[in-house]
């Protein structure tokens, strides 16, 4: 290490780390016997104190004592102020040699070697003599946790009684050795070099004997010994101990009689291999320097830590931060001792220096330790919580000499007075900068400009104030980055003038009773201020590029007499003032209708925003692969269109012979790269006439005889012969039956839709009707329609079709001549005849047997169905069949504008 004796011999670290023999007990009043010269060369020997009165409590290594001119390292003394303590030496190191120690019985010298570390001593005046009489008492009256080490008068000067060169911390010493500790001739560079050399030798010695952790940082080191280690028997608890315990704590054997001076060393101190101890290690303090001597009081000694058996080892530190190490503004004023949680990111000491804040506070012996993070600082008081509205429920009545400021929240209605924005501005307006020309007045959403009206007062003209306000979630106030801009010109109809109120530009207009106290705001634009000019203001915290939304704020003061006014205020919807082009895109919010015939020609009305006079509406269709298949521009009616409404004519679809609805899309374009999102639209197929179908359409009846007329009266699709007809897919028949085809149905079974008008060859496309899908509904009975070609009378046999119907109401066909009575449950042929045209709005498409039918109908007949019953044909002839056919043809109603068939 360095020269520690007059013979410049090296200190032997083996004995320091527990390799020497047991030394005889030390005398109570002086030093113990020196080491035998033949056993070992002059070396360090630790003189340990007696176990503390709290029984096997760890002994903390205190700081070195303050220097006293002309004396050697006195015992620690309490400071005058309670709760603070002056430095204490760590322990005595007895050097073997021919010289005798001060007050010692032998020739050994005692060297106070605080952990073999170099540390700074804050020179302060000697403590008061009144406190020297009780060196073992704490300021709070509690006994000291450990006694001072033996031979407290170490640190001999060079050439002293024992002779030899050794450390001298006293400023009064005149040693010129570079190893003299803080001597007059020492400098900081020499101290740092000594620290580096001592630390390297300590690390080498510890690694040689394996007495410590190989980890570099003591705070990250594991336990320096295991619980089975006999040295751990002297610890106060079996809990895990951090490496700082091995640096800072000494253990003592079992309880022994307490004594102010120890009788003999009771254990060896162990060191961790590397790293820096916590603040209790007497390392060079950042606060202690050569240039600061005499400027600061001595730091207090570390307080012993009462360990919590359940607390983890890395949190066990010894040493209380001196009150001087905490800034005055953050010093804790309470009398409680708090322990700050260690920070893993704290750097280790460098050259014997510890970072500020590395010292830990401890509680008095026996007290529980409080680990509260951040207790080095006073709690910051919470900011004052302002109410959301400063006036709360106060009435908006003010004196004319003390009008409310612009950031004062005001209601829009008070009693009968109300300030209302009749027409709101649109949601986007491009504000202009100070270096460019005006971009015009703020526009309204439906076109034109905003309109403001005062309700409940029309006695005399009033002044309407307008300014640009904020649009965030906070209280309404003047906007810092935008101001109102006065617009003038031939097209401006509203007179206005500018004023400045509390640094905010205000536009003032007049509300006239002849205008119903309304004003058209066509004279107000928005001016954008430079962000840098505003952000550099004192107290401004907003950022300009993030505050681009504003509101138009209108305020009026209505006089009430007696020098009082009622102030009401109204704010518009938020307005986006940025120059982003996305805000200028047209938007379609609604449109009607949503479907049209493929022939087009219908009027389509679009509602949205940002529509221009030259806006276009384009219909497109894309294929499954996404390729454009059809594109057509619609014709826009400019006379009926404005900024929020577009009226146009739907164009024709490219294919007019579609049999199902076609999905297309349209969009509004304000120019290149300014298109609205696409909207869906449907083109529907149209109703068309067909040529008369062949006789195969009349299939489904047993007879193969031809009809006496060539007109197709079958309103149902062609169907196979009767045996397979009941098993048809009902979804194919539903569109037609839903329109009322198949009207000869008993009321017991439901049927939907009105009866059709007679039109030859009329057929609707299935896609224009709602289908029921392929789900099989409950089966119902269905009566086929009779035809004159049916030789069996067309009484209609019942068979299951499986279609849902609603129950119809009965109707009365024209009366027929009397005929033989009918036996059977089925109605006569006349039951399925349609009504004349004037009867459609009154009755349904059919009726059941004997329900609403005249007596002639009930008695007519003489024939029966040949399908389901065995009633024989009685007395029917071919002439009667022809007569019935003629009556049937004359009974069909004619549609409007057409003559019935002859």
Swiss-Prot record:
Phosphoserine PTM sites in chain numbering: 168, 170, 213, 217, 289, 344
Domain IPT/TIG: 586-683
Biological processes annotated in GO: brain-derived neurotrophic factor receptor signaling pathway; branching involved in blood vessel morphogenesis; calcineurin-NFAT signaling cascade; cellular respiration; cellular response to lithium ion; cellular response to UV; dendrite morphogenesis; heart development
Keyword DNA-binding recorded: yes
Keyword Mitochondrion (UniProt): no
Cross-link Glycyl lysine isopeptide (Lys-Gly) (interchain with G-Cter in SUMO2) placement: 689
Known outcome of mutating residue 217 to A: Marked decrease in phosphorylation by MAPK8 or MAPK9. Complete loss of phosphorylation by MAPK8 or MAPK9, but no effect on MAPK8/9-binding. Decreased transcriptional activity
Subcellular localization(s) per the UniProt record: Cytoplasm; Nucleus
Domain RHD intervals: 401-582
Region (Disordered): 16-180, 208-369, 791-870
Tissue: Widely expressed, with high levels in placenta, lung, kidney, testis and ovary. Weakly expressed in spleen and thymus. In the hippocampus, expressed in the granular layer of the dentate gyrus, in the pyramidal neurons of CA3 region, and in the hippocampal fissure. Expressed in the heart (at protein level).
One cellular component term from this protein's GO annotations in UniProt: chromatin
Stated consequence of mutating residue 213 to A: Marked decrease in phosphorylation by MAPK8 or MAPK9. Complete loss of phosphorylation by MAPK8 or MAPK9, but no effect on MAPK8/9-binding. Decreased transcriptional activity
Residue window of motif Nuclear localization signal: 268-270, 672-674
Residue spans of the SP repeats: 213-229, 277-293
UniProt PTM comment: Phosphorylated by NFATC-kinases; dephosphorylated by calcineurin/PPP3CA. Phosphorylated on Ser-168 and Ser-170 by MTOR, IRAK1, MAPK7/ERK5 and MAPK14/p38, on Ser-213 and Ser-217 by MAPK8/JNK1 and MAPK9/JNK2, and on Ser-289 and Ser-344 by RPS6KA3. Phosphorylated by GSK3B. Phosphorylation by GSK3B markedly increases NFATC4 ubiquitination. Phosphorylation at Ser-168 and Ser-170 is stimulated by UV irradiation. Phosphorylation determines subcellular location: the hyperphosphorylated protein is cytosolic, while the dephosphorylated form is targeted to the nucleus.
Regulation of its activity: Transcriptional activity may be repressed by ESR1 and ESR2.
Gly residues bias: start-end ranges: 96-109, 151-165
SUPFAM superfamilies hit by this protein: E set domains, p53-like transcription factors
Residue spans binding DNA: 430-437
The record's note on its domains: Rel similarity domain (RSD) or Rel homology domain (RHD) allows DNA-binding and cooperative interactions with AP-1 factors.
Quaternary structure note: Member of the multicomponent NFATC transcription complex that consists of at least two components, a pre-existing cytoplasmic component NFATC2 and an inducible nuclear component NFATC1. Other NFAT proteins, such as NFATC3, or members of the activating protein-1 (AP-1) family and MAF can also bind the complex. NFAT proteins can bind DNA as monomers or dimers. Component of a promoter-binding complex composed of STAT3, NFATC3 and NFATC4; complex formation is enhanced by calcineurin. Interacts with CREBBP; this interaction potentiates transcription activation.
Identification of the protein by name: Nuclear factor of activated T-cells, cytoplasmic 4
Protein encoded by which gene: NFATC4
């Amino acid at each position: 290490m360095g020269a520690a004796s007059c013979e410049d011999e090296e200190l032997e670290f083996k004995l320091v780390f527990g390799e020497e023999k047991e030394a005889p007990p030390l005398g109570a009043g002086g030093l113990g016997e020196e080491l035998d010269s033949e056993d070992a060369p002059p070396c360090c020997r630790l003189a340990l104190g007696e176990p503390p009165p709290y029984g096997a409590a760890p002994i903390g290594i205190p700081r070195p004592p303050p220097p006293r001119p002309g004396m050697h390292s006195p015992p620690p003394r309490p400071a005058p102020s309670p709760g603070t303590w002056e430095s204490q030496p760590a322990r005595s190191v007895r050097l073997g040699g021919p010289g005798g120690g001060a007050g010692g019985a032998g020739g050994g010298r005692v060297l106070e070697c605080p952990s073999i570390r170099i540390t700074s001593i804050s020179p302060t005046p000697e403590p008061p003599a009144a406190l020297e009489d009780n060196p073992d008492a704490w300021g709070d009256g509690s006994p000291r946790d450990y006694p001072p080490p033996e031979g407290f008068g170490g640190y001999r000067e060079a050439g002293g009684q024992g002779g030899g060169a050794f450390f001298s911390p006293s400023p009064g010493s005149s040693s010129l050795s570079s190893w003299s500790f803080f001597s007059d001739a020492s400098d900081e560079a020499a101290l740092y070099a000594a620290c580096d050399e001592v630390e390297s030798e300590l690390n080498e010695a510890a690694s040689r004997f394996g007495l410590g952790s190989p980890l570099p940082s003591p705070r990250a080191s594991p336990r320096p010994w295991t619980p089975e280690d006999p040295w751990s028997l002297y610890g106060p608890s079996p809990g895990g101990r951090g490496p700082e315990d091995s640096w800072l704590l000494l253990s003592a054997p079992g309880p022994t009689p307490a004594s102010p001076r120890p009788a003999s060393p009771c254990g060896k101190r162990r060191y961790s291999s590397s790293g820096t101890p916590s603040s209790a290690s007497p390392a060079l303090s950042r606060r202690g320097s050569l240039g600061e001597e005499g400027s600061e009081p001595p730091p207090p000694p570390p307080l012993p830590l009462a360990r919590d058996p359940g607390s983890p080892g890395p949190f066990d530190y010894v040493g209380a931060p001196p009150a001087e190490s905490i800034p005055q503004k953050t010093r804790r004023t309470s009398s409680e001792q708090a322990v700050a949680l260690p920070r893993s990111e704290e750097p280790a000491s460098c050259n014997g220096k510890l970072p500020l804040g590395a010292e830990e506070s401890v509680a008095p012996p026996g007290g529980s330790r409080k680990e509260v993070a951040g207790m080095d600082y006073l709690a910051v008081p919470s900011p004052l919580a302002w109410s959301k509205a400063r006036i709360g429920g106060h009435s908006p009545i003010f004196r004319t000499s003390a009008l409310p400021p612009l950031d004062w929240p005001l209601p829009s209605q008070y009693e009968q007075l109300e300030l209302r924005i009749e027409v709101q501005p649109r949601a986007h307006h491009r504000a202009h900068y100070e270096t460019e020309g005006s971009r015009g007045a703020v526009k309204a959403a439906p076109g034109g400009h905003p309109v403001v009206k005062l309700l409940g007062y029309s006695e005399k003209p009033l002044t309407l104030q307008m300014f640009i306000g904020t649009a965030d979630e906070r209280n309404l106030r003047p906007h810092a980055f935008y101001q109102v801009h006065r617009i003038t010109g031939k097209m401006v109809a509203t007179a206005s003038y500018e004023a400045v109120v509390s640094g905010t530009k205000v536009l003032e207009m007049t509300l006239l009773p002849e205008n119903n106290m309304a004003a058209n705001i066509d004279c107000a634009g928005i001016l954008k201020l430079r962000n840098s000019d505003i952000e550099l203001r004192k107290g401004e915290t907003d950022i300009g590029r993030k505050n681009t939304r504003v509101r138009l704020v209108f305020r009026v003061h209505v006089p009430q007499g007696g020098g009082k006014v009622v102030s009401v205020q109204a704010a518009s919807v938020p307005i986006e003032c940025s120059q982003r082009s996305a805000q200028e895109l047209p938007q379609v919010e609604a449109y009607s209708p949503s479907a049209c015939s493929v022939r087009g020609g219908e009027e389509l009305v679009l509602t949205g925003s940002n529509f221009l006079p030259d806006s276009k509406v384009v219909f497109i269709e894309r294929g499954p692969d996404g390729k454009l298949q059809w594109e057509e521009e619609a014709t826009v009616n400019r006379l009926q269109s404005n900024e929020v409404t577009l009226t146009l004519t739907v164009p024709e679809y490219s294919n007019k012979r579609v049999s199902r609805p076609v999905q297309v899309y349209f969009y509004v374009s304000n120019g290149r790269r300014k298109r609205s999102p696409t909207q869906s639209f449907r083109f529907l197929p149209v109703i068309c006439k067909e040529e008369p179908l062949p006789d195969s359409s009349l299939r489904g009846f047993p007879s193969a005889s031809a009809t006496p007329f060539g007109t197709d009266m079958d309103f149902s699709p062609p169907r196979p012969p009767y045996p397979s007809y009941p098993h048809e897919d009902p979804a194919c028949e539903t569109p037609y039956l839903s329109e009322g085809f198949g009207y000869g149905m008993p009321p017991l079974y439901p049927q939907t839709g009105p009866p059709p008008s007679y039109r030859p060859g009329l057929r609707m496309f299935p896609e224009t009707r709602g289908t029921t899908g392929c789900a099989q509904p409950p089966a119902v009975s269905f009566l086929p329609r009779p035809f004159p070609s049916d030789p069996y009378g067309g009484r209609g046999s019942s068979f299951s079709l499986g279609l849902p119907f609603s129950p119809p109401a009965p109707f009365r066909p024209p009366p027929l001549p009397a005929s033989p009575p009918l036996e059977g449950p089925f109605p006569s042929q006349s039951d399925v005849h349609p009504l004349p045209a004037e009867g459609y709005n009154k009755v349904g498409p059919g009726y059941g047997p004997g329900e609403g039918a005249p007596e002639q109908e009930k008695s007519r007949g003489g024939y029966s169905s040949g399908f389901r019953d065995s009633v024989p044909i009685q007395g029917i002839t071919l002439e009667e069949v022809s007569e019935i056919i003629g009556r049937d043809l004359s009974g069909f109603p004619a549609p409007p504008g057409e003559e019935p068939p002859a």
